[in-house]
């Protein structure tokens, strides 16, 4: 008869074997012994399924088939990093740091792993949830697939409740083996290890993810300060003591010269690593100095990513095609003989505009040098003129739009040629793709391929038509089944409730980006107010300059725009700003003004997003972790370690009912 004590002993033994092998790269037993212990564990679990926990080593082999990936909100945003491409960029970064916090600084330099950013949540030392970065605010729940990565411990060495960030990746050797198998089976090959890792973590069948031999390096906690450390380097050391895998090739540098030396070293040695890196990350080491530097909307001001110089590769320029963007700009695109650049196969590259082609004397048939700008976007650097045979053809931009045959114009102070026909099909199609994108109306399931199908089959001619699509028509599209169509229609319906700034950005008004759209929405509150605004009123608003104001006035003077807005209203699309408007609230109403608030536990009446929105509307900033800098903790039922820490630090604790008292009288956020 199986002994539960022996079962628990086996779990601890197998966890230690995995730690030795996958985390510190120091195997202590032969594979046969590991396999024997695992088989013993599996037999016990078969006899006693009631003993099995999510932390069992048996859960790493996969087997669970998922229905899909739920959305996960990051309590602390997973910000991206600003890039540096040369010593001058790094010197500017260093100067900004010193101007703010003084000269007593040090930088932790780490290898920038070319993988997929993920977040791991541990509760009382046990692995609870894993998620992708997503857009930094909302990611996808990939808990089950991350569990298959052997270097991720299911239990920490201490019972901490923390959120850890890191980079999941596929080692070069695993990538090579995977592509060899796919080639034998006649499947499409992965372009690079990063794509392979991302694809593996989005498998619905966890057995597939388990077979891909992924790995991970952890590089941060959502809030290192709550761990009682004062520096980033001490935080990384702490992660190692918890049993988490941290890259050992890090170095603390006290000067830019030391940073440059570290960069030069790894620029030379990067090819020798067992995994891909695409740069070096610098982080201000002192956590208090990090706090002083703060963050922008997108990235921390205390960290920067140095990107390695782009690889330059020669290939043949076969042709030049013209693309029409949503604002009518005509962009020439190089059609290339396929070639591998920075880990992916490139067959097309931007040529930007006619002036650049003329200036660089780029001709069809040339051998050209291409690179990836920032290792992402392919571009043509120059023609290799000494390889010309005389058969190459100079390129001349047409005088008419390649899509609608309208006359092309060059507007004052612009380099690009532009089609100004508002009914140009290419512009309408690109505008539709923009309208449904993540930063605009964010309609899940309406990707570029679906938009192109809808447009080519004349099911939509403008953005308003999206809101009148029927289930019957959608089911006629390729690869659109009952479930996909139901989900898509639900997503379209949900998007009608978006706040005004989302709609404004989605409409694609020239020069109006996401930030300006938010400023306009906050100031005017309704579309009706905005569309009658004059230039003087517009330019009085932060972020709105003369050129943008002219563009907005011109846009709303168009009768076709009025008709479009009426159609959107008829469809039930919200045309008011529904976000917080702090400047109109009194000090008494702004109960959380300038305060940091932490939500913990299960809320009964408010969703977590509603609670967060309410706190922000009252002037507060919502954080994911409790520290000495926390001003208030709002605790629901089953609140755990965060509540205990708040009590220990004597931080004021609110109940959900306390928070609900501040809901607006007209019904508030939870209706």
Swiss-Prot record:
SUPFAM superfamilies given in the database record? BRCT domain (SSF52113), DNA ligase/mRNA capping enzyme, catalytic domain (SSF56091), Nucleic acid-binding proteins (SSF50249), RuvA domain 2-like (SSF47781)
| Keywords assigned by UniProt, alphabetized | DNA damage, DNA repair, DNA replication, Ligase, Magnesium, Manganese, Metal-binding, NAD, Zinc
- Documented EC number(s): 6.5.1.2
Q: Where does Zn(2+) bind?
A: 401, 404, 419, 424
| Record keyword Nucleus present | no
User: Which residues does NAD(+) bind?
Assistant: 31-35, 80-81, 110, 133, 167, 283, 307
GO BP, one annotated term: DNA repair
Q: Catalytic positions?
A: 112
**Main EC class the enzyme belongs to:** ligase
Q: Which InterPro entries match?
A: BRCT_dom, BRCT_dom_sf, DisA/LigA_HHH, DNA_ligase, DNA_ligase_CS, DNAligase_adenylation, DNAligase_N, Hlx-hairpin-Hlx_DNA-bd_motif
The protein's superkingdom reads Bacteria
Q: Which SMART domains match?
A: BRCT (SM00292), HhH1 (SM00278), LIGANc (SM00532)
Q: Which GO terms describe its molecular function?
A: DNA binding; DNA ligase (NAD+) activity; metal ion binding
Where does the record place the BRCT domain? 587-671
Q: Does the keyword Zinc apply?
A: yes
What is the reaction catalyzed? Answer: NAD(+) + (deoxyribonucleotide)n-3'-hydroxyl + 5'-phospho-(deoxyribonucleotide)m = (deoxyribonucleotide)n+m + AMP + beta-nicotinamide D-nucleotide
Entry GO CC = cytosol
- What is its cofactor? Mg(2+); Mn(2+)
- What family does the database annotate? Belongs to the NAD-dependent DNA ligase family. LigA subfamily.
Please give the function described in this protein's UniProt entry. DNA ligase that catalyzes the formation of phosphodiester linkages between 5'-phosphoryl and 3'-hydroxyl groups in double-stranded DNA using NAD as a coenzyme and as the energy source for the reaction. It is essential for DNA replication and repair of damaged DNA.
Quote the HAMAP family the UniProt record gives: DNA_ligase_A (MF_01588)
NCBIfam families from the UniProt entry: dnlj, PRK07956.1
* Name of this protein: DNA ligase
Query: Which species does the entry assign this protein to?
Result: Listeria monocytogenes serovar 1/2a (strain ATCC BAA-679 / EGD-e)
Q: Gene for this protein?
A: ligA
């Amino acid at each position: 008869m199986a002994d539960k004590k022996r079962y628990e002993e086996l779990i601890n033994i197998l966890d230690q074997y995995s730690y030795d092998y996958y985390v510190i790269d120091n195997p202590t037993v032969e594979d046969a012994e590991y396999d024997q212990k695992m088989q013993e564990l599996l037999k016990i679990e078969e006899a006693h399924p009631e003993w099995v926990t999510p932390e069992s080593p048996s859960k790493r082999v996969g087997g669970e088939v998922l229905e899909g990936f739920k959305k996960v909100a990051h309590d602390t945003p997973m910000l991206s990093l600003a890039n540096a491409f040369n010593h001058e960029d790094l010197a500017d970064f260093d100067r900004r740091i010193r101007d703010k916090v003084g000269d007593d600084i040090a930088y932790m330099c780490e290898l920038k792993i070319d993988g997929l950013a993920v977040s791991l949540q541990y509760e009382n030392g046990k692995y609870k949830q894993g998620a992708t970065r997503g857009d930094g605010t909302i990611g996808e729940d990939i808990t089950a697939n991350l569990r298959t990565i052997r270097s991720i411990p299911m239990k920490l060495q201490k019972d901490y409740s923390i959120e850890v960030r890191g980079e999941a990746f596929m080692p070069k050797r695993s990538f090579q083996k995977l592509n060899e198998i796919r080639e034998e089976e006649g499947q499409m090959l992965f372009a690079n290890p990063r794509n392979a890792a991302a694809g593996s973590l989005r498998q619905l069948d966890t057995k597939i993810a388990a077979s891909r031999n992924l790995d991970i390096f952890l590089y941060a906690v959502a809030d290192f300060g709550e761990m009682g450390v004062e520096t980033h380097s001490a935080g990384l050391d702490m992660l190692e003591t918890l049993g988490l895998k941290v890259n050992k090739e890090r170095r603390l540098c006290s000067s830019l010269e030391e940073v440059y030396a570290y960069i030069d070293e790894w620029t030379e040695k990067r090819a020798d690593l067992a995994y891909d890196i695409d740069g070096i990350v610098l982080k201000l080491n002192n956590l208090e100095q990090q706090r002083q530097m703060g963050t922008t909307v997108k990235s921390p001001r205390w960290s920067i990513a140095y990107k390695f110089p782009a690889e330059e590769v020669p290939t043949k320029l076969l042709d030049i095609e013209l693309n029409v963007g949503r604002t009518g700009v005509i962009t020439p695109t190089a059609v290339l003989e396929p070639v591998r650049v920075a880990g992916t196969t490139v067959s097309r590259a931007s040529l930007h505009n006619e002036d650049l082609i003329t200036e660089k004397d780029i001709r069809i048939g040339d051998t050209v040098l291409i690179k990836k700008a920032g290792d992402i976007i392919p571009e043509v650097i120059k023609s290799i003129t000494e390889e010309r045979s005389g058969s190459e053809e100079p390129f001349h931009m047409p005088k008419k739009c390649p899509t609608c045959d309208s006359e092309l114009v060059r507007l004052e102070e612009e380099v690009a040629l532009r089609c100004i026909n508002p009914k140009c099909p290419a512009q309408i199609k690109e505008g539709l793709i923009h309208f449904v994108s993540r930063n605009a109306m964010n309609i899940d399931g309406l990707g570029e391929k679906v938009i192109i199908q809808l447009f080519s089959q004349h099911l939509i001619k403008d953005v308003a038509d999206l809101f009148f699509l029927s289930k019957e028509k959608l089911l006629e599209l390729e690869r659109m089944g009952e479930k996909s169509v139901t989900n898509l229609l639900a997503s379209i319906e949900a998007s009608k409730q978006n706040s005004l700034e989302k709609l404004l950005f989605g409409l694609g008004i020239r020069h109006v980006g996401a930030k300006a759209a938010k400023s306009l929405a906050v100031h005017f509150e309704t579309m009706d107010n905005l569309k009658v605004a004059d230039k003087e009123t517009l330019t009085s608003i932060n972020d709105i300059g003369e050129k943008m104001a002219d563009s907005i006035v011109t846009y709303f003077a168009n009768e076709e725009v009025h008709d479009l807005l009426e159609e959107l209203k008829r469809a039930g699309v919200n045309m008011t700003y529904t976000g917080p408007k702090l400047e109109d609230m009194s000090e008494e109403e702004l109960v959380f003004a300038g305060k940091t608030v932490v939500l913990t536990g299960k809320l009964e009446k408010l969703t977590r997003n509603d609670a967060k929105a309410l706190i922000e509307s009252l002037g507060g900033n919502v954080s994911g972790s409790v520290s000495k800098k926390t001003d208030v903790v709002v605790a629901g039922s089953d609140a755990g370690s965060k509540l205990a820490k708040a009590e220990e630090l004597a931080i004021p604790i609110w109940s959900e009912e306390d928070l609900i008292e501040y809901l607006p009288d007209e019904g508030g956020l939870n209706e």
